[in-house]
Amino acid sequence: MHIRRPGVWRLRLIVLVLLTYVPAATAQKSASETQPAEQQVASTHESSGAGEGGRRTMTALRLADDESIVLDGRLDEPIWSRAVPAAGFIQIDPFNGRPATEPTEVRIVFDGDALYMGVICYDSEPDRWIGYQMRRDEGLGSDDRFMWTIDTFLDGRTGYFFEMNPSGLMADALLGMNGQNREWDGIWNARVRRSEIGWTLEIKIPFRTLNFNPESDGWGINFQRTVRRKGEDSIWTGWARNQELRRMNNAGLVTGIRDVTQGRGLDIKPYGLVTSEASPGRGSTAMTGSASAGVDLFYNPTPLLRANVTVNTDFAQIDVDQRQVNLTRYSLFFPERRDFFLDGAIFFDFGSDTDGDRQGQGGNQRIIPFFSRRIGLSAGGEPERIDFGTKLTGQVGAQDVGLLHVRTGDNDGADTVGEDFTVARIKRRVLEQSYIGALYTRRGARTSGIGPDHTVGADARFATSTFLGDQNLEAGGWVLSSSRPGVSSDRSAFGATVNFPNDRWIARFDAAEVQEHFDPAIGFVTRSSYRRYAPTLDFAPRPSNHPYIRQLTFGGSVDMLTDLENDLLTRTVDLTLIQVNLHSQDNFSVAATNRREWLDEPFGISQGITLPLGAVYDFTRYRVWGQTANRRILAVSGRLEIGDFFSGTRTERVLNLNLRLRPGLFLYLTGQWNNVRLREGSFTTQLYRIVGETQFSPFMSLVHNIQYDTQSAVVGWQSRFRWIVTPGNDVYLVYTHNWLDDPLRNRFSTFDRRFASKVLYTYRF
């Protein structure tokens, strides 16, 4: 088919410069630092300081045989007074490089089984603490918090992230070269206590929770504290804005940890499950009950490797996916939520999944060769039976390795057969922050008689944090090839990225080609037969001593897709006319987007409305976005987007209300409305979400999630109760109910409902 070439591009770039801030007459003075009169742990020691090469160091103190730590947040054991603290935190914001206005001290001690941390967060106004959240792994964008990272391998690339707040919330993540995995749940424990000097934390991290080299007594470590009411972030080391806590190469050093044990490195985690369900929408109206059991085994064959075996796997306790409205030609992306696949997921990351799309305006062209939601879930997101899975992740010498094999079972009630899935990933660390790697995936049905699908790939990433002195620079490239029966050509994809992610200037360029028959069977791609070019440039100055404005952002991006003959398919120009971040933590932005799109196939945008093949559209849209500070009892955010849309117009409104009635009691309301008027027809979409949370303690919570959207015409309700009896031992009660809009009866009818009760227990050896 002949593809029409567009004429001379008329990039109607909108240029608007809004530099309308007024410098403050006088610089704000930082709050004076005061030392509380009463302390539970006297600050009589000098804080840990710089070691060799200027790296800040501290020493962990070993408990005597007759000493122990009681987790109560009091820090009243004698060893806490003997331990030398890490102190002298420096501000990242708002006054970069100045001492923190509220001091923080961190002490580390250990015994043969666990690492203990004692943290004092001094506060000159101790009654003004902010700690709304208590539920495990909730975000802390609204709260005071204390965060820390541990680089147990001292490689400057990987590590563990932890955070807590004054209400005792515990959150964690795995850090890797391609990002972080927030879904990782390590087994650790902590207690918090608030008093007239501020708030204190007493933390216990079993060595069995961490992978590390027992021959090395030096770990990378860093700490950061947020005082939310002041908008102040301070850090122990690496306070330059280009450095950031999660960049492990900026961490300090803790020494003295030796003669410790990970035990036998064996965790056995059995579960028991009881369910009752009915599916009137599928012809099964009676509630039917069932009971099942399974087990997860975790074993460390070496201190640096972790093996996992799961048998009769079930994920009844996971949260439901958050609904999305799709008005594009591309598939929506829903993240993985199942524990087995999330544990160690960073070892399978591949360089093509950079997710460099700006504001979602470029069509979200993600290329992921291994996407674990392809395993054990139908195209509609319904769970399929997983008989067993095995996984090995960790380090072997200079290599990061990930091996995975999963077998799914036949489903007699659906048109699915059992399959085998295999993934192998290796990355060799080179230089200080770089790697080269390879990937292999295989997917094959056991009974279909059709040969398996394969994907092979290689990637490389080179990074430095010392470009031009103290700037970050990253560059990477990748190549992939898929193989499936009956396809012998045009099966590849390849691309490259250059990234300059810094505080004042942010620049990026992505380029990729996806050939016609490229199809990673265990992957995620939105389309094939295209080339993509996507430059981005942002300028983000910080007005000096301005009384209200913390940072401004101006910038733009171009996201262009062509076919393999370089004929234009889509071109999106997105301009941030201005974004303003205030000291009050309120933010707003104004932006404009121009998009040119040629339809290489008919586009059914809504029921009964199809845009024709070959049509070319050029349209401009404008958006205003704003949000109030999350630290407030009522936080509001919203977006208004107006302008042309394909052959007509579209108005989109989004409103989010977050009501924090008291610590642990929340109500979240979300609404999204689209009003679309096209030559081919008009339609509206609506999406609503109501989430109510009751967090009884950091270890017990009840969450209600109600969602409705007009595209699916389904009301979904999930209630999820979780009780962490002790870390690693959980009780879940989950009720899910879906109603389908029945226009014939003019009411909603039950489509399916399910109740599940699940108990998990961890035995550690």
What do the PLM-derived regions correspond to, one by one?
Residues 12-22:
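Bacterial N-terminal signal peptides
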Residues 1-9:
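N-terminal secretory signal peptides that target proteins for export/translocation
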Residues 385, 466, 470-473, 477-765:
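Exposed, low-structure sequence patches enriched in small/polar residues
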